[in-house]
Amino acid sequence: MKRIIIFASGSGSNAENIYHQFFNENIEIVAIFCNNEKAGVIERANRLEIPLVLFNRNDFTNTDVVDKQILSYKPDLIVLAGFLWKIPERLIALFPNKIINIHPSLLPKYGGKGMYGHFVHEAVINAKETKSGITIHYVNEHYDQGDYIFQAECELTPLDTAETLAQKIHLLEFAHFPQIIKKTIQ
C-alpha cells in the first residue's frame, strides 16, 4: 500500500476527489495536514475519517514539529492540493522528489508568490490569454519552479471570466491530478 499525505489550506475539494479516486486502490491518504483552522478541508477529513493535523506557521517554518508529524506517517508522497505556504527547504531535503504541487496555470506563466486561485484566474483573463490550464510539478525551494510532471490546457473565449475559468481549471484538476499522483507514486 502506497501512502500519501495531502497538504491543503482551503475547501479540500481536490483532497476529497483524490480520496474517492483511490478508495479501492493500493494508495491511501494517511493524513491531511492543514494550516487554516477555518478551512473546509477539516470537515471533509472528519467526514472521510482521514487523520487531520492542524499546524501553525511557527511550527511549520521554524521548528521540526511538523516534520516529525509527517515522518510518523511514513509517506511515499506528499501532495500539495491548494496549500498556500512555501515549503521549507529542510522539508524538501527530507523528501527529495517526493513533494508535488498542482498550480492553476500553465507555468511558467502566472506562478510565484501570491499567485494562487482567483488571483491567477483574474491575471489570465486580464491578459486576454486564449488558453490556460494546470501544471503539476515537483516542489523545490522556489514558488512554482520545480520540474514539471504534467500540464493540461483548456481553451478560453472572450466571454470567459475569472469564475468560468476557475470552473474549467477545476475540471482539469479533477480529471488529471489523481492519475498523475498514481503515476508519480508507482
List the predicted regions and their residue ranges.
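One-carbon transfer enzymes
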Residues: 1-186
